[in-house]
């Protein structure tokens, strides 16, 4: 065979290989899209097997993400005997890379760029000067001088804990609130939640082999306007007044799911669960954005990954689907009142 015939044969094989690989990728993408789409349906929340399986990503398999049925079993949500409101159609979702601590520099256009709260300038550690060669005469003199004990050497002061970096809208909303305002005859935070007909869940799971520390979680929650209250979990109200509607709540992903104040200093957990129940907030879409920003704030400051209510990666498409569920719920609420 001539060189030309060899080149034609090789080119034909390369083209066939590219076509076969393209068909294989299309089939795999279609299967994954159907699996994710079927996994986000609101109609199947009651049948979620989420709490029956261990999460292999977490140490000892002890942490499980939280579904609506799990929240109801723990008593965080009141059961509603009426049929849950769900969307009639679900959009196909193309799998993309999820939100994680590595995604801080990327902007998907979903939220405004975060405002970084600059921590106080840390004291730089003292730099020891390089050793200088001295003449023999000076060395002899130094032998007669009393040696300085090592403990007397200057030691760097321990670094102060850096304040958490809070995203823009949550920071501004929390800053508008009156700190340490005295409360009289106000209910416990989260005690006024109505019966939930729709629940949106965002899980934040630590990376394999790592844990979230209770003291850091407490500081971050308080910086984001959350308050420890009913059911020994954290809640965020629309204002510092606990009679206002609850925007969202945060529970421990490990049984029994609580954040008791006396245990926060020594607490460590591989995951936490944010959940927002509908009806509830006056502005449900804004409450969801605050919940999402707070979850992303945990990822930014403490590491970890965002997961949805079925332990799947929280993609931009998943977040947009949650917003669509809120819009559909509000639309059906308006049609029922009409």
Curated annotation (Swiss-Prot):
Residues on Periplasmic side: 1-2
Membrane topology: Single-pass type I membrane protein
InterPro entries assigned to the protein according to its UniProt record, in alphabetical order: Cell_div_ZipA, ZipA_FtsZ-bd_C, ZipA_FtsZ-bd_C_sf
Localization (cell): Cell inner membrane
Transmembrane spans: 3-23
Stretches of the chain found on the membrane's Cytoplasmic side: 24-338
Disordered, as annotated region: 33-192
Biological-process GO terms, alphabetical: division septum assembly; FtsZ-dependent cytokinesis
Compositional bias (Basic and acidic residues): 70-81, 138-162
A Pfam family that the UniProt record links to this protein: ZipA_C
UniProt GO cellular component terms: cell division site; plasma membrane
Entry similarity comment: Belongs to the ZipA family.
Complexes and interactors: Interacts with FtsZ via their C-terminal domains.
Role, per record: Essential cell division protein that stabilizes the FtsZ protofilaments by cross-linking them and that serves as a cytoplasmic membrane anchor for the Z ring. Also required for the recruitment to the septal ring of downstream cell division proteins.
Name of the protein: Cell division protein ZipA
Organism from which the protein derives: Marinobacter nauticus (strain ATCC 700491 / DSM 11845 / VT8)
Gene encoding the protein: zipA
